[in-house]
């Protein structure tokens, strides 16, 4: 299964990609929103994991572009816990939301859940 991870903190991106690789996912990593958009436009992904706060295009802007291209499930990663962010994500049809900090095992569990649900569509 091919996953795109868009995370601007290199150490975090490396840790998350390693955990996903160990769980048998093939992971491409983009370190900013513009690179994330290029990956999305040039490849097929079963799931996209987006940090909300990104340089270039932020996670919300990137999510709007993802939805124009199809229904690929999206998992947002953020430190923001405000109701406004949750509502915005719902308006943009996010599929799941994970608050930082979190354990890599929790991320893997959420990814599995989203991919199982998406196969049921």
Roles of regions detected by a PLM:
Residues 1-120:
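N-terminal/domain-start alpha-helical segments
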